[in-house]
Amino acid sequence: RVQATFFLLGENMEGRRKMVEELVKDGHLIGNHSYHHVQLNKLSIKEAMGEIEKTNRLIREWTGEAPVYIRPPYGAWSQELEKVVDMIPVFWNVDSLDWKLQNKEQVLSCLSGQVEEGDVILMHDGYQSSVDAAFALVDHLQKQGFVFVNVEEMVLE
């Protein structure tokens, strides 16, 4: 069994409460990915906070816990947001390009030989090819001795 962190888009959560509850029940960590997948650093602070807070409310209401971590869409973050957002921004150092390739074999090829201990791999759940690639990647990396943890466990280490 693998632990992961799912950074959820508020607009994609709508109508999927059971799925979110299942993720939590399965021991995964839930983080915020904004409401509309916009570049937060291009918005006013008030608009950016609205994007974050709207998704935080949904997560808190559905899981009983306020999210601690946020993955800003496109990795777009600013010093101003850092000052006003009381959350820990999480970035990645390995991009699977799954959003662009939309092909399981190409995603696996892209990641082949790239992943090292301590890496944060960026993947998306919006494409079946990404989901299929994630399962195949987990199997492949576990056979190599990799252990999967959620973001919180990485931060605490």
What are these regions (language model features)?
Residues 15, 20, 30, 77-79, ...:
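A broad, structure-centric signal for solvent-exposed, well-ordered loop/edge residues
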Residues 116-152:
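Catalytic grooves of carbohydrate-active enzymes
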Residues 38-65, 76-117, 130-133:
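Alpha-helical scaffold elements lining the catalytic groove of polysaccharide deacetylases
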Residues 70, 80, 152-157:
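A short, charged, Gly/Pro-tolerant segment at domain boundaries
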Residues 11-22, 68-75, 95-102:
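Phosphate-binding glycine-rich loops and adjacent basic patches that engage nucleotide phosphates
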Residues 8-10, 32-34, 71-74, 93, ...:
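A cross-domain feature marking catalytic cores of carbohydrate-active enzymes
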Residues 1-54, 58-61, 65-66, 138-140, ...:
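Active-site beta->alpha N-cap acidic-glycine motif
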